[in-house]
Amino acid sequence: MANINENYLKLKAGYLFPEISKRVKTYSEKNPSAKIIRLGIGDVTLPIVPSVVDAMIAASKEMGTAGGFHGYGPEQGYSFLLKSIANNDYGSLGIKIDESEIFVSDGSKCDCGNIQEIFSTDAKIAVSDPVYPVYVDTNVMAGRTGEIGADGRYSNLIYMPATKENGFQPEIPKEKADIIYLCYPNNPTGTVTTKEALRAWVEYAKKNNSIILYDSAYEAFISEPGVPRSIYEVAGAKEVAIEFRSFSKTAGFTGLRCAYIVIPKELKGRTRGGEEVSINSLWSRRHTTKFNGVSYVTQKGAEACYSPQGKKEIQASIAYYMSNAAKIREGLKKAGYEVFGGVNAPYIWLKTSDNLSSWDFFDRLLDKAQVVGTPGSGFGPAGEGYFRLSAFGKKEDVEEAIARISFL
């Protein structure tokens, strides 16, 4: 009998979203006629835009010809997509990113979870609290976190509380962190950061030889001027930061699977002996060993997102979701809730009513309003007493959900 990786036994009892699904299923079985409105997990509801559909149809037909068939593609991504990403997502910001610094993948969740594999198992990890669970759980699996305490925190993790009192801006740790996870626009709080704050993080990383893992999956939802769209807007960030982007929420690719990670050539790590090593080269070795690449058809669809018509159609979808966010935000405010986010992100973070715990509030919404959201405590101890709602639902469902909640 083979021994197991016992670090998996240190994981919390259940991943957040399966637990939500379990509770909803139990309620549905007992109340089969109930119309449940789901504003929990951040899955999109609008269809893929026409420009992307047309591009994928054309690519599929191309694959059906002798001259246009594509088998295994380049693991890092086809040049046509790499070039579009570099020119549109970074060139438009005045940031120069080379094609060789971009790696196309099947999702930011995978990238955020897999990137830790190239770092030492004794690397000190810092995460905000609340936090996207994948950042923590993958490091638990790798054995970096130690044991979980009664307060829900792992003994070897550095937790950086993001609270109402500090404007949901995690404070730079006083101790040295090797790897720092940052997410802006933030999941779950829906808040954003400033260039000044990012500059301070870059300075900290340089001083401590740290690497920042910057999750920017919701960048396309930024609406206010002056809000940074990339950490590379800060001078020197290429020397200390990796950035994650995704087509999932931006272009509705949750069912198609396409994202990318940017690892600048300037970024270095160290061996135990002090030798500098290219992080780009390390990730390239890992990526090409474990991943065969995103399909040609999907990458042609992703490329179409950058066409003039594709951009127009995608912006319309984003506007639809952000209109939902405004409805949720304003509706909850009128109902007396304290709310955050929902301006530059598709998530609304609210304080639970009557000092209920996050899960008790979940049960109340499900039982009394048949509305499903996400308990804040599922994102970390500092999320206790808070709740996340997603703007990715259908307009009519969002309006009905807010009406139901308002009558509680």
UniProtKB/Swiss-Prot annotation:
It comes from the Bacteria. Keywords: Aminotransferase, Pyridoxal phosphate, Transferase. Its EC number is 2.6.1.83. Coiled coil: none annotated. Its cofactor is pyridoxal 5'-phosphate. It catalyses: (2S,6S)-2,6-diaminopimelate + 2-oxoglutarate = (S)-2,3,4,5-tetrahydrodipicolinate + L-glutamate + H2O + H(+). CDD domains: AAT_like (cd00609). Pyridoxal 5'-phosphate binds at residues 72, 108-109, 132, 187, 218, 246-248, 257, 292. The modification N6-(pyridoxal phosphate)lysine is found at residue 249. GO terms for molecular function: L,L-diaminopimelate aminotransferase activity; pyridoxal phosphate binding. Pathway: Amino-acid biosynthesis; L-lysine biosynthesis via DAP pathway; LL-2,6-diaminopimelate from (S)-tetrahydrodipicolinate (aminotransferase route): step 1/1. Substrate binds at residues 15, 42, 109, 132, 187, 292, 388. InterPro entries: Aminotransferase_I/II_large (IPR004839), DapL/ALD1 (IPR019942), PyrdxlP-dep_Trfase (IPR015424), PyrdxlP-dep_Trfase_major (IPR015421), PyrdxlP-dep_Trfase_small (IPR015422). Involved in the synthesis of meso-diaminopimelate (m-DAP or DL-DAP), required for both lysine and peptidoglycan biosynthesis. Catalyzes the direct conversion of tetrahydrodipicolinate to LL-diaminopimelate. Homodimer. Belongs to the class-I pyridoxal-phosphate-dependent aminotransferase family. LL-diaminopimelate aminotransferase subfamily. This is LL-diaminopimelate aminotransferase. The lineage of its organism: Bacteria, Pseudomonadati, Spirochaetota, Spirochaetia, Leptospirales.
